[in-house]
Amino acid sequence: MAKGKENRIVITLECTEAKKEGKTVSRYSTTKNKKNTTDRLVLKKYNPNLQRHTLHKEIK
């Protein structure tokens, strides 16, 4: 039998550079495997408000 999907959780990624500049932040939601990736996720994603790729960090 197949194992369940209890290891995958939904997370939210928030732009860090827009927060520093005082602009509107962009947010993405994605999933991660909490057994393989125990620390906070940091990805480079597109921010449409700043019109460039910026760092997005995982928030609670």
Swiss-Prot record:
Q: Which terms under GO biological process does the entry name?
A: translation
* Native organism: Chlorobium luteolum (strain DSM 273 / BCRC 81028 / 2530) (Pelodictyon luteolum)
Q: Which domain of life is it from?
A: Bacteria
Family stated for the protein in its record? Belongs to the bacterial ribosomal protein bL33 family.
One Pfam match: Ribosomal_L33
Q: Which UniProt keywords apply?
A: Ribonucleoprotein, Ribosomal protein
Q: What is this protein called?
A: Large ribosomal subunit protein bL33
**What Gene Ontology terms describe what this protein does at the molecular function level?**
structural constituent of ribosome
Taxon lineage: Bacteria, Pseudomonadati, Chlorobiota, Chlorobiia, Chlorobiales
Is the keyword Ribonucleoprotein in the record? Answer: yes
GO cellular component labels: cytoplasm; ribonucleoprotein complex; ribosome
